[in-house]
Amino acid sequence: MEGSDDDDGVPQLSSHALAALQEFYAEQQQREAQKLGPDHEKFSVGSVEEDWQLSQFWYSDETALSLAKEAIEVCGENGRIACISAPSIYQKLRGLAGESVYIRLLEYDNRFAVYGDDFVFYDYNEPLKLPESLEPSSFDIVIADPPYLSEECLQNTAQTIKHLSRGKIILCTGAVMEDLAAQKLGLKKCKFIPEHTRNLANEFRCYSNYELALDKQGLA
């Protein structure tokens, strides 16, 4: 009954379990406090922890940095870059690029709202539900990493990519999606192979509609 003070039948934690639980919460609070501290790098990969329930697996520092440099080289000093479901690339971009580069992170996870106006809430189930500020064909390069290896997810994300892009596209996804990437976006497999901080069960590849500078430089 609502508001009852009767504790009969309610399981009680042992003193040992309660102490362990309190220790866990204390450690969690300490980690969050460190993130807000002056020594924490706001734009470092891993500053926001992976949420596996959202199919989040961050790129390695080297991969995120390589793709960020690729995007900056493509768009130039006053370019426009969209990152769709690719927060670790966004983090490297914002750490490298000057304020003259317009960068937007389209992402479902609201924890990334800490990045202010750069953050745009994005749900691939509603691929064209975007703010008016994200005009059609307004980005020099779009980098996307659809969260799920499903035909529906890639098809919907492809709608967003085609809406935003006025030129270059980089797609990072599983090798099993190669045919669909070619069919929906006209992309070809790159030599460059993206890596993650954790080993994934599925083979992961990079696709684009142009020859990556990374491939030309032999950094694949």
From Swiss-Prot:
Keywords on record: Cytoplasm, Methyltransferase, Transferase
Domain of life: Eukaryota
Single Gene Ontology MF annotation: methyltransferase activity
GO biological process entries: peptidyl-lysine methylation
EC number, as in UniProt: 2.1.1.-
Keyword Transferase set for record: yes
Entry-linked SUPFAM superfamilies: S-adenosyl-L-methionine-dependent methyltransferases
Compartments where located: Cytoplasm
Subcellular location, principal: cytoplasm
Record-level GO cellular component terms: cytoplasm
Function: Protein-lysine methyltransferase that selectively catalyzes the trimethylation of EEF1A at 'Lys-79'.
PANTHER family: EEF1A LYSINE METHYLTRANSFERASE 1
Family as reported in the entry's similarity comment: Belongs to the class I-like SAM-binding methyltransferase superfamily. EFM5 family.
Protein name, entry field: EEF1A lysine methyltransferase 1
Lineage per the UniProt record: Eukaryota, Metazoa, Chordata, Craniata, Vertebrata
Gene transcribed to yield this protein: eef1akmt1
